[in-house]
């Protein structure tokens, strides 16, 4: 894909297992649309920021969709503050903008708990991070894709029928 010539209206999706899973479940959808999936399971925002140039900018897309932050909150690579999470997502968006790539920032999807980290309650951090990301997007005239408000169960967890577990939507 890195050597693929630029197609009209190309969109890159960058994220974690949630993004990666879209390609598993709907591979033809991505191929038909010319979408490029750059989701890597388990990744945190610092890891995505490191690969942002090669996985997004070098592909010269028209649009990037950023869905990130849940694995930071799950402490996959150690504790992470809300500021660090949102700063990394904002840095990715600034890199895209400086390369004339339109940015769509996705909310962090609701989660009540993490099957792999049962001691962590992510709900407060998700709400706070989403508030910061929404404000940043609005202030900078970016699209904010609000999955959270449509997918939470009233207790800030993922609606059961929307997920294969408490984190990953189906």
Located regions from the model:
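A general structural detector for well-ordered alpha-helical segments in enzyme core domains, enriched
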Residues: 51-55, 85-92, 122-125, 129-133
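Charged, glycine-enriched surface loops/patches
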Residues: 82-106, 134-142
